[in-house]
């Protein structure tokens, strides 16, 4: 399980790479990872922009235009920024297509990670 320094490093790295990027589409390949209704999750994230990056304990909180995307890496979760031409593997469970032509890919070999959309009033 990533410790707090690793979680903070993930957060700062993502902030540097995707702040200001808009989500064009979301591909959920393992629906059990999503705490919300999957279709609602995908629709609500579409056209949202990554604005702020926060951490509460080991939870990553991505402030979007009108909601918060909360993510917990659990045991082995990792985020990658990749070109869409790079092949995915069976451990890539959520893929965010971004407006710069790149993809933010969430990979978790053990499938323990979780994502949830929160309203802004939760923070």
Where do the model's predicted regions map?
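Structured catalytic/nucleic-acid-binding cores of DNA maintenance enzymes
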Residues: 1-121
């Amino acid at each position: 399980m990533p410790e707090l320094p690793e979680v903070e490093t993930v957060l700062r790295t993502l902030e540097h790479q995707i702040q200001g990027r808009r989500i064009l589409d979301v591909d959920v390949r393992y629906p059990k990872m999503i705490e919300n209704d999957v279709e609602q999750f995908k629709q609500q994230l579409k056209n949202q922009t990554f604005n702020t990056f926060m951490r509460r304990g080991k939870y990553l909180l991505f402030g979007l235009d009108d909601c918060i995307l909360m993510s917990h890496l659990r045991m082995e979760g990792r985020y990658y920024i990749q070109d869409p031409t790079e092949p995915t593997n069976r451990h890539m469970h959520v893929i965010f297509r971004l407006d710069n032509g790149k993809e933010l890919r969430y990979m978790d070999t053990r499938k323990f990670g979780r994502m949830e959309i929160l309203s802004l009033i939760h923070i």
